[in-house]
Amino acid sequence: IPVAVLRYVIINKTGRPLRASVCGTLPNFIGADGSKLGQDWKSDPLTSGPKKNKNEFRATAGLRGLFMSSDGVDPKDEAFGTIALAVAAGTRGTSRTAWLAAGWGTPLLDFWDDFSADGMLDPRPEMGEDMPFGSLTVELDVPANGSAETTFLLAWHFPNRRTWSPKGTPDDLIGNYYTTKWSDAWAAAEDFAGRSAGLEARTVEFIRAFATSTLPAEVKEAALFNLSTLRTQTCFRTPDGRFFGFEGSSNQAGCCFGSCTHVWNYDQATAFLFGQLSRSMRETEFLEATDAQGLMSFRVRLPIDRAREYGKAAADGQMGCIMKAYRDWKLSGDDAWLGRLWPAVKRALAFAWIKGGWDADRDGVMEGCQHNTMDVEYYGPNPQMGAWYLGALRAVEEMARH
């Protein structure tokens, strides 16, 4: 769900009730993703891209807040979309769809003078700025020696994901799965608001159960700290529902494309928490990225009909995918799913036995040139590749017996 929850708790340490106001402010940055840069008056880098962006106040059955869109950004631009900043309907507060249009720090000073005076905002005229600021307040009554809380929802809807392996052609635009579920950011925020209590309760239940388990503290820390990766820009789904991932995230873009097989070998969370997503990765690896000879491209190009273009296999990655196919089958119990993958699984294992291959003499030990997760080629027997290979052999044996 493309929504961030920002919850603020105001604590009153005095013996008398207080009225407080919390303000959320956001620039309408549609069109700006950091890839397009200009210069400010000091010749320092300045993000550019917004054009004829506009803010409007909305009030619906469940929410009130600001809806941000653009009339000038190219609808096919990767940074084109909508944003919403909202709070629960029925809360007291004011808003601005624009700040004062003036030079230097005057807009900020005007905002602060207005807000700090009484906790409310007076409107300012819209001056046609390309990246207008919007502000939204919530007024709270805080009891003596008590507390009060308010929640802001920040939602987004950006449909134009581009492939991680562009060719400069129209099919570089591959889209985002989540934007097929909601029409815009406001719709996503409304849907979330109606289900937020249940979603939060389930999340807390999972975390509490895991945190209070008898697993060693080091295991719990490592597992929980890394779960957040699934909710970052490292991972995404295309409109057909397939799940993909970079190796990680850099400051402005994903790092190392392709759902790299030998990197994603170390992911266990997806399979145990979101089995359908994990199985979609196996489907991509075996049904799309594996050729007739059994070579599995260890990086997948997109769109999906280009899945085999990379054309290079990784010994640990390929053997690991075989083991993961076994794991995902055991977790799901879906024999029909395994049946679809089985011919490609067999080819992927047999690829190790081709002439000049990883284990050309079929003695159960890899001796050939073995590209691997260390980004080098191993030659000759070694325990690192050997473990993956023996695991794949054993997994295939179990699947074959079934």
Predicted regions and their residues:
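Polysaccharide-binding surfaces and accessory modules of carbohydrate-active proteins
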Residues: I1-D114, L136, R161-T163, K167-S213
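Active-site neighborhood of glycoside hydrolase catalytic domains
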Residues: N382-H402
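Inter-helical turn/loop segments and adjacent helix faces that build the functional surface
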Residues: I11-K13, P17, D328-G339, V396-H402
